[in-house]
Structure formats: C-alpha cells, structure tokens
A protein has these predicted regions:
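Basic/hydrophobic alpha-helical interface regions
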Residues: 1-69, 73, 77-114
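Negatively charged
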Residues: 107-213
C-alpha cells in the first residue's frame, strides 16, 4: 500500500521531533542521530538499521508514543555507534543479537538514571538489559555477554529468562519448538525489538565502518 504524501510528511515530522528531543535530553545520542538518514520500509515489521539508514515499518511507527520512539531511536543508533552491525559475523546470530540488545538497552537505561520506563514498550514490556550473571549489560561488551549466554545454555538460562522477562510480555506469541542451540532462549529472544538481518549484508572493509571509529 502506497503511503500518501501527507502520511510521509507526518512520519518525517515525528522523526525530526524525536531527534530534537533526544538532542536536548541525551546530547550524546542526539549528535549521533544527526549523522543518520531515515526511511520507511513496509516489509520490515518493526525497525532496522544497516549502519547508514534507520528504517521504520510505518505500522510499527504508528504504534509508538513519543517516549517509545525516542527509546527506539537511541537503541538503533547505539547499535551503529558500538559497531554491532560490523561485529559478530562469525557468531551464532540469534545469541549475538540478544547480547547486543542487552548491552544497548542497559546503556540507554544508564543514560536515563536507571529509570526502566525509558526502555519499556507498551507492547513488549521492559526491554532486556541484564547480563546472565544478573549484572547490568553496560558493564560488558556484546561479545562478553554472548559468551555468558553460551555458558548459560542448559545451565542457568531458566533463571536468566525469568529475570529478564519479569516485566515483558513478548511480541510474537506461540510455543514452537526448535532444534537450534538457542532453543532454550527462544522465549527470551522474542523480546528483541528490532530487525538485525541487515547486519549480515555489511562488509567489514567498508568506509561506513570508519565513520564510527
């Protein structure tokens, strides 16, 4: 379905106002967001970045209030700034995506005086932000959290899931079983907000990476 010019203008205004709010309240994130381009993608279901552009599904954008939109904008730009888009290519992707989100969400939480409302979506609840050892994700790199997640598979992951999902409803329902090595984290992984599939298409040698060094 083709979007009307008025709708596109409405979305453009919302994203611009979000950048302005973030620039006033969290200058670090606001300045980073000024380097990005923005777009719409009706097929992506939520939101994603390829390191150059942050693209929203219009339906997902319509569901977000201003506070939620600001959180999502900060979430996406921090993935880029921390080079999550360029790293972890050789790692198990589902597990790495979870690790990256834990680190990003925890850093956003820290930037907002540990107010969990700032990393909460009405549809999903409180975003995951604790490492498997119960400490905040901002204390670690994504790779360090990834290694913890690997060790927790089949050991303490039930407790880990419970801790991180205490205030989360999850976005995608269902109880499908999987043979993946991450099947024990399938419920927990549903709390991933954005789409990380574009990361696989980014080559390490690109000049794009140099922008964020």
């Amino acid at each position: 379905m083709e979007l009307s010019n008025n709708k596109i203008k409405e979305y453009t205004k919302r994203l611009m106002l979000s950048k302005m709010r973030i620039l006033c309240n969290n200058g670090f994130y606001g300045l980073l967001l000024m380097h990005m381009k923005y777009g719409l993608d009706e097929e992506c279901e939520t939101v994603y970045t390829d390191g150059k552009v942050i693209r929203f599904d219009p339906k997902f954008l319509d569901e977000l209030n201003d506070d939620e939109l600001d959180f999502i904008m900060m979430h996406e730009i921090l993935h880029v700034a921390l080079q999550h888009c360029f790293r972890g290519i050789e790692l198990e992707q589902e597990l790495y995506n979870i690790a990256c989100d834990i680190v990003v969400n925890s850093n956003i939480l820290l930037s907002n005086n540990m107010d969990t409302r700032t990393i909460t979506l009405r549809s999903d609840g409180e975003a995951m932000h604790l490492a498997p050892n119960g400490k905040e994700g901002y204390e670690y790199t994504a790779e360090e959290v990834y290694n913890m997640l690997q060790k927790n598979l089949g050991v303490n992951n039930a407790k880990f899931q419970s801790t991180n999902r205490s205030n989360s409803k999850g976005k995608k329902g269902g109880d499908e079983k999987s043979n993946k090595p991450t099947e024990h984290l399938s419920e927990f992984g549903r709390n991933i907000i954005d789409n990380h599939t574009k990361w696989k298409q980014i080559e390490k040698g690109e000049k794009l990476q140099e922008l964020w060094l």
